[in-house]
C-alpha cells in the first residue's frame, strides 16, 4: 500500500464514518494528506484529517479521530491507528499491506512512478535557446540538463511534451558575430563589442578552408558568407554538444522565420484590430499594463523597425496556434521581466495567460580548489558545456546541474564531482544501483529468485524504512511535475540510495555460505529488486545512466 493508496482508504473510511453519523461528507478535502512522522516510533504514516474537518461538522477533533481510528483498525491493511495530540492519527500498516508496495513495483517495472494526471496538457517546453554566437556556457548547460529532465518528468505524468530550441538568428548580435569571424580570418583584432576566443578563430579558418575565395568577394558578400556559414557551423556544434550531453529537441525554431513568413506582421495586425496596440509619437505600443505588465511596451519603433518584443509576440501566437495549451519558457537570470511581458502578450492576443509559464534559472559558478573558473564569451575565457563534460563526465555534469533548485545560484566544485566517494552524490546513487545489480547476479548464481516471495516477512525496521521510501516515489514524481522541479527526483534518489545502504548493512539479503535459502532471503531479494527498479526509474528521469557495474 503506497501513501496514495492509504490516503484513498482514509478518505473512503471518513466518508463511511461521517455518513453513519449523518454528518456532511462534502467538507472532506479532495485529497487526504498522508505524511511520514518525523519520529518512526509514532507509526508509519500520519494524517490530520480529523483536525481538518471536525469544526466543519461540529465535532470535537479527538472524537472524530477516535471514530476514524476504530474504523481504520478494522481494515486488514491497517495494523494500528492511534490518536495523538488534539486529533492527529498515527497509522501502522499491516506487514502484508506494506509489502504490496514491493509487489506493485515489480509488476509495473519501468512505469512505476508514472501517472496520467497531466494528460490534459500539451506542453511546448522551450529551453537552452542560446544565441548561435558561441558555445553553450554554464547557464545554458544548466537548462540543457534541467529542461531535459523536466520534459521526462512531465511525460511520466501523462503530458504531451514538445522540446523546442528557439534559434536566435535575427538581430544585431549575429552581425557582430559575422564581423568577429571576418576580423579573425583577416588576422585583425576583435571588433569592439565583438566576440573573441579560440572558437572564433577555428570557425573563421574553417570558413576560409571551405570557401578559399571568401576574402576576395565584395565586402557585403563576404560578410554575408561569414554570417551564414558561421551561424550554421556554430549551430551544428551546439546541436552536437547537446546530443552528446543527452539532450535532444523535437523542434529547432528559427527566429528569422517569424519575420520572413510574415508572422510578426500578422501578430501586429491582430493587436491593432483588437485595440491592444496603440500609436504614440510615431511608435506602436502594446497595452501590456492592462494585462499585468509594469509598463506598456514598444512593439514597432518610430522608425518603422520592429522592437525585439515583436518577435516574442509572434512566437507566443505561433506556439498557441500549434495546439499547445501550456508554453513553458526556461530563461536566464537576466530575463525576469519577461514573465509579465510574455503573459501580457498572450492575453493581448486573446489567449489564456496561464498558458504561459516562465522559469528563471540563476547563474552557475565553476570552482577549482576553491577558486572560481571565470566564464566570459567575449573575453575568450568561456567555460562551456563541453568543458564541464570533459572535466567531470556527462552523468556528473547533468546530475550536478539538476539536483538543486534553479531558483538559487549554483556552485559546482569540480573536485567533489570528480571524486569516487560517497561525498559525490551521483556516485553514491549510481553505486547503490550497481550494488543492487551485483546482488541480482549473485542471486542468479546461487539459484535464488524473488518468485513467490512472502513479503509479509519484511518486518525489520530497516526493511520498513526502505519500503516506505519506495512508496513515496510516485508522489515525488507528481510533485516534480506539478511544481516544475525535477531536482526533487535527484534528491529522492539520494534518499533512496542512503536508505538502501543502511538496509544492506543491517539485513543479509542472500544466504551465507553455510545457510540454506530461507523465505526471508527470497523476500529481501524481492525488496532489493524493487529498489533497483525504482533507482533506475529515478535516474532515467534525470537523464543519468544506471550502471550495472562500477
UniProtKB/Swiss-Prot annotation:
It is found in: Cytoplasm. Belongs to the class-I aminoacyl-tRNA synthetase family. The keyword Transport does not apply. This is Arginine--tRNA ligase. It comes from Corynebacterium glutamicum (strain ATCC 13032 / DSM 20300 / JCM 1318 / BCRC 11384 / CCUG 27702 / LMG 3730 / NBRC 12168 / NCIMB 10025 / NRRL B-2784 / 534). Coiled coil: none annotated. The lineage of its organism: Bacteria, Bacillati, Actinomycetota, Actinomycetes, Mycobacteriales. InterPro entries: aa-tRNA-synth_I_CS, Arg-tRNA-ligase, Arg-tRNA-synth_N, Arg-tRNA-synth_N_sf, ArgRS_core, DALR_anticod-bd, Rossmann-like_a/b/a_fold, tRNAsynth_Ia_anticodon-bd. Its EC number is 6.1.1.19. GO terms for cellular component: cytoplasm. Keywords: Aminoacyl-tRNA synthetase, ATP-binding, Cytoplasm, Ligase, Nucleotide-binding, Protein biosynthesis. GO terms for molecular function: arginine-tRNA ligase activity; ATP binding. SMART domains: Arg_tRNA_synt_N (SM01016), DALR_1 (SM00836). It comes from the Bacteria. Monomer. Induction: Up-regulated by arginine and repressed by lysine.
Amino acid at each position: 500500500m503506497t501513501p496514495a493508496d492509504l490516503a484513498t482508504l482514509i478518505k473512503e473510511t471518513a466518508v463511511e464514518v461521517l455518513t453513519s453519523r449523518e454528518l456532511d461528507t462534502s467538507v472532506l478535502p479532495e485529497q487526504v494528506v498522508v505524511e511520514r512522522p518525523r519520529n518512526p516510533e509514532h507509526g508509519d504514516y500520519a494524517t490530520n484529517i480529523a483536525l481538518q474537518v471536525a469544526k466543519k461538522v461540529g465535532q470535537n477533533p479527538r472524537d472524530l479521530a477516535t471514530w476514524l481510528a476504530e474504523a481504520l483498525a478494522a481494515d486488514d491493511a491497517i495494523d494500528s491507528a492511534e490518536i495523538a495530540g488534539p486529533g492527529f492519527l498515527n497509522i501502522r500498516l499491516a506487514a502484508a499491506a506494506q509489502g504490496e508496495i514491493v509487489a506493485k513495483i515489480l509488476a509495473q517495472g519501468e512505469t512505476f512512478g508514472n501517472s496520467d494526471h497531466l494528460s490534459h496538457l500539451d506542453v511546448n517546453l522551450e529551453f537552452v535557446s542560446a544565441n548561435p554566437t558561441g558555445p553553450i556556457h554554464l547557464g545554458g548547460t544548466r537548462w540543457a540538463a534541467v529542461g531535459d529532465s523536466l520534459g521526462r518528468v512531465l511525460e511520466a505524468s501523462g503530458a504531451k511534451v514538445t522540446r523546442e530550441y528557439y534559434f536566435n538568428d535575427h538581430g544585431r548580435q549575429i552581425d557582430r558575430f559575422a564581423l568577429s569571424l571576418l576580423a579573425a580570418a583577416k588576422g585583425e583584432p576583435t571588433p569592439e563589442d565583438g566576440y573573441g576566443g579560440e572558437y572564433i578563430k577555428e570557425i573563421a579558418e574553417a570558413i576560409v578552408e571551405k570557401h578559399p575565395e571568401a576574402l576576395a568577394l565584395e565586402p557585403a558578400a563576404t560578410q554575408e558568407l561569414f554570417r551564414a556559414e558561421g551561424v550554421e557551423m556554430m549551430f551544428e556544434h551546439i546541436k552536437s554538444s547537446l546530443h552528446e550531453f543527452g539532450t535532444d529537441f523535437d523542434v529547432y525554431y528559427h527566429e528569422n522565420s517569424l519575420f520572413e513568413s510574415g508572422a510578426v506582421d500578422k501578430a501586429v495586425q491582430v493587436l491593432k484590430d483588437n485595440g491592444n496596440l496603440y500609436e504614440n509619437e510615431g511608435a506602436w505600443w502594446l497595452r501590456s499594463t492592462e494585462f499585468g505588465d509594469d509598463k506598456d511596451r514598444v512593439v514597432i519603433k518610430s522608425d518603422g523597425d520592429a522592437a525585439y518584443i515583436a518577435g516574442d509576440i509572434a512566437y507566443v501566437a505561433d506556439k498557441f496556434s500549434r495546439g499547445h495549451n501550456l508554453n513553458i519558457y526556461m530563461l536566464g537570470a537576466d530575463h525576469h521581466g519577461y514573465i509579465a511581458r510574455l503573459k501580457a502578450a498572450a492575453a493581448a492576443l486573446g489567449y489564456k495567460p496561464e498558458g504561459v509559464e516562465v522559469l528563471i534559472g540563476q547563474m552557475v559558478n565553476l570552482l577549482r580548489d576553491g577558486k572560481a573558473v571565470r566564464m566570459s564569451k567575449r573575453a575568450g575565457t568561456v567555460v562551456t558545456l563541453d568543458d564541464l563534460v570533459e572535466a567531470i563526465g556527462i552523468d556528473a555534469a547533468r546530475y550536478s546541474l539538476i539536483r538543486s533548485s534553479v531558483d538559487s545560484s549554483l556552485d559546482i566544485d569540480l573536485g567533489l564531482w570528480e571524486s569516487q566517494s560517497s561525498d559525490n552524490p551521483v556516485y553514491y546513487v549510481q553505486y547503490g544501483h550497481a550494488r543492487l545489480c551485483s546482488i541480482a547476479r549473485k542471486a542468479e548464481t546461487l539459484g535464488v529468485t524473488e518468485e513467490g516471495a512472502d513479503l509479509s516477512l519484511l518486518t525489520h525496521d530497516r526493511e520498513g524504512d526502505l519500503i516506505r521510501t519506495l512508496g513515496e516515489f510516485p508522489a515525488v514524481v507528481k510533485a516534480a511535475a506539478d511544481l516544475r522541479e525535477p531536482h526533487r527526483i535527484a534528491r529522492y534518489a539520494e534518499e533512496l540510495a542512503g536508505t538502501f545502504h543502511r538496509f544492506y548493512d543491517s539485513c543479509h539479503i542472500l544466504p551465507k555460505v553455510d545457510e540454506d535459502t530461507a523465505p526471508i532471503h527470497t523476500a529481501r531479494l524481492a525488496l532489493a529488486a524493487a529498489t533497483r527498479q525504482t533507482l533506475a526509474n529515478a535516474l532515467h528521469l534525470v537523464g543519468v545512466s544506471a550502471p550495472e557495474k562500477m
